[in-house]
């Protein structure tokens, strides 16, 4: 509707936003733009829940996009340029799916979510990733073609850590976070030492 509507959001109330063309509301495909904390996202899938979250410094507004992990979420993940080699994109899709599954269902009150849409978990760009000029369809196709592929241990998805740079070698989880994960191993990563590929993060200091 036209105009502006003001809605008081009390501490015990959740405000849900739905739009046409989703699993939650029938109608033509619709895009919405959401601006939160100065960042604008274009969203196509799911629904949004707005809630007042208590923090040590007081209350703040949390906005959560509830989407289906298998496709709607993974289509919007932006952890790698979509023009990179297919094998790299396939590995990223499998790692992102595995990481998300390892966190799914574990509610975090600090964000009213299972997964942060930032580097705290995985960067979620939303529909903008899917409609990237020329290459957006490539990423969506990779996600679809690798559907169901995950990395597991004892039948459960591992926390599939990944990073853009490593300083030349990967690290053990116990050295980084204090708890052991036997599927993390120290291996050489020569690509991180290539000045042409990685000029900003070739040199690291261990502290």
Where do the model's predicted regions map?
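Conserved, single-site charged/polar hotspot
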Residues: 1-207
């Amino acid at each position: 509707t036209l105009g502006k509507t003001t809605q008081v959001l009390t501490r015990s109330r959740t405000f849900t936003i739905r739009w046409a063309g989703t699993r939650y509301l029938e109608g033509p495909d619709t895009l919405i733009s959401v601006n939160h904390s100065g960042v604008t996202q274009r969203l196509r899938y799911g629904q949004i829940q707005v809630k007042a979250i208590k923090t040590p410094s007081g209350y703040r507004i949390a906005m959560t996009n509830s989407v289906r992990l298998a496709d709607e979420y993974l289509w919007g993940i932006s952890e790698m340029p979509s023009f990179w080699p297919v094998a790299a994109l396939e590995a990223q899709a499998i790692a992102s799916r595995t990481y998300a599954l390892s966190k799914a269902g574990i509610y975090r009150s600090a964000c009213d979510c299972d997964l942060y849409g930032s580097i705290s978990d995985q960067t979620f760009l939303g529909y903008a990733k899917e409609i990237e000029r020329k290459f957006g369809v490539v990423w969506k196709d990779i996600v679809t073609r690798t559907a169901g592929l995950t990395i597991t241990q004892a039948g459960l998805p591992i926390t599939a850590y990944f990073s853009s740079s490593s300083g030349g070698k990967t690290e053990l989880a116990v050295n980084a976070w204090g708890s052991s994960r036997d599927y993390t191993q120290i291996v050489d990563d020569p690509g991180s030492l290539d000045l042409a590929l990685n000029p900003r993060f070739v040199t690291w200091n261990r502290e």
